[in-house]
Amino acid sequence: MSFSPSMSEVGADGLRLVTDERAAERGIGIFFTDRRGGVSAAPFDSLNLAARVGDEVDRVEENRRRVAGAAGFDVAYLALARQVHGARVIEVRDGDAGVVGEADVLVTRARAATIGILTADCAPVVLWGDGVVALVHAGWRGLVAGAVETGVAATGKVNAAWVGPSIHACCYEVGPEVIDAFEGRNLPVADGAHVDPGRAAAVALQGAGVEAIVVSEVCTSCDRSYFSHRRDGVTGRQGTFATLT
């Protein structure tokens, strides 16, 4: 992965998490997974973290336990959303765990909680504020719906943001309805037929007043160590996780 000089890898037994050392110093843990180091069989090989894509549930649960162990959070207090490509927010409170409802933005001020989103081309966005952290699932529909701006509003003053691995314009040709929707929101379009969710998320963050933004250079379709729905169709999901420390 290529993020910034402060990003580093942790993990063992083939599992690798990318984290940010500066974030840890500021009291937030953030972790990005790829597809390596799990127990799922093809086409979900191997660190699939999604239970609703056709994989065996016990394997998904083991994969989540492995990630939690490597990252140092309690999987019993992991909160996820049923992602619907919109902009609905759910605040995760002490004691919330599992699938907490339909949303594409999760925010928490609870130090016992870990929040997570799952992706396979959409851009995962981490937002950090004073005593609060949020995650945004930013696919093209969510970007057009204003999910990033909604996440910023839910966080309050955003001190820093991270945009994780997503599909890039090189691999993401879309139809005219997507191009029209992006242009209507002043989101970037490449060559009149391609979009980049990560770059669009960064533009939306800047428009919402966020100044400190780290953006991954990884294209999930180009890099086969990541799950990509556009490239593979039926496949698994990598995860992005955040917790207050």
Where are these regions (language model features)?
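Active-site microenvironment for binding and transforming phosphate-containing groups
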Residues: 1-245
